[in-house]
Curated annotation (Swiss-Prot):
This is NAD-dependent protein deacylase SIR4. Residues 1-10 form a transit peptide. GO terms for cellular component: mitochondrial matrix. It is an enzyme of class 2 (transferase). Residues 11-305 form the Deacetylase sirtuin-type domain. GO terms for molecular function: histone deacetylase activity, NAD-dependent; NAD+ binding; zinc ion binding. InterPro entries: DHS-like_NAD/FAD-binding_dom, NAD-dep_sirtuin_deacylases, Sirtuin, Sirtuin_cat_small_dom_sf, Sirtuin_class_II, Ssirtuin_cat_dom. The keyword Zinc applies. Coiled coil: none annotated.
Length: 305
């Protein structure tokens, strides 16, 4: 398999790479499923984890919050919600980029069977005119908040309004400094929608569930948290029903994504990977393109009709 991967590694131009993917999609007659990662959203201003400008490159000490921390001591939730409060405006205002629009176009033309995304930014949904039933957000979405006790749900925008009301000093700073990203309060945005904070957040307040006084948590799968079984099973079925898999913008470092690639490979499904930088699935791919996603997907969508 390794020799086959090297033989099909595309080292040429954007046009060459797009041409290779045109052949890949056409060969599988609309039964290719996509798996997308953070690299798809970098052109929308949301950084990835491991890319050249990713959070791990910018901050070697970065550690995302763990599920057990969030449900543990109060201080962890204070820190999380303070960071999320400051990061939310940029996430909520982010716009789909060329990658999202190209993927939406490919699906509308029936060239792909569905899209499994690791991203929690909601940009795949914003790129389509009609709600896409074949989009699966395996790690959830930042746009909703759930009570972990009773299941009460509210939109993240409503949560932001509540946080503004009970933290007027921080809100006033944010209102007066909407573009300030490296000041005393906050530095740059992280992939999970929060920011690094450089101030004492011990007085930051956050609301509890209005129904049962339980803990409110963003509707995302934290590190150390199990993916819902229904989501896992749906992702497996999408892979099983497909004839091929195209991975875009993911290093496949997270097991929930890597296992989908391994599942496809275990049944002999052809795999193509478009990602700038190494991925854990490289040895399983028949086509490997080491480029960013936007230019290649835009060329692909403009070529294939």
């Amino acid at each position: 398999m390794s020799a086959q991967v090297m033989h099909n590694r595309v080292m040429g131009t954007v046009k060459d790479s797009a041409s290779k993917l045109v052949d890949f999609l056409m060969r599988h007659h609309g039964q290719t499923v996509l798996l997308t990662g953070a690299g798809v959203s970098t052109d929308s201003g949301i950084p990835d984890y491991r890319g050249p400008q990713g959070i791990y490159s910018r901050n070697k000490d970065f550690k995302p919050i763990q599920y057990q921390q969030f449900v543990g001591p109060h201080e962890f939730r204070q820190r999380y919600w303070a960071r999320s409060f400051l990061g939310w405006p940029k996430v909520s205002q982010a716009q789909p980029n060329a990658s999202h629009h190209a993927i939406a176009a490919l699906e509308s033309r029936s060239h792909i069977a569905g899209c499994i995304t690791q991203n929690v930014d909601g940009l795949h949904r914003r790129a389509v005119v009609i709600e896409n039933p074949n989009l699966l957000e395996i790690h959830g979405t930042l746009h909703w908040v759930n009570c972990i006790s009773c299941g009460y749900k509210l939109q993240r925008s409503a949560m932001q309004e509540q946080l503004q009301k009970i933290n007027p000093i921080v809100y006033e700073w944010q209102r007066l400094n909407p573009e300030k990203s490296n000041a005393d309060v906050a530095s740059s945005l992280n992939p999970d929608g929060d920011v690094e904070i450089k101030w004492d957040y011990n007085h930051f307040k956050y609301p509890h569930c209005p129904e049962c006084n339980g803990l409110l948590k963003p509707n995302v799968v934290f590190f150390g948290e199990n993916m819902p079984m229904t989501v896992r099973d749906t992702s497996f079925k999408m892979i099983d029903d497909a004839k091929a898999l195209l991975v875009v913008g993911s290093s496949l470092q997270v097991y929930s994504a890597l296992r989908l690639v391994k599942r496809a490979a275990s049944t002999g499904k052809p795999i193509a990977i478009l990602n700038l930088g190494f991925t854990r699935g490289d040895e399983l791919a028949q086509i490997r393109i080491n480029l960013g996603s936007s230019a290649v997907l835009e060329e692909l969508a403009s070529t294939i009709r």
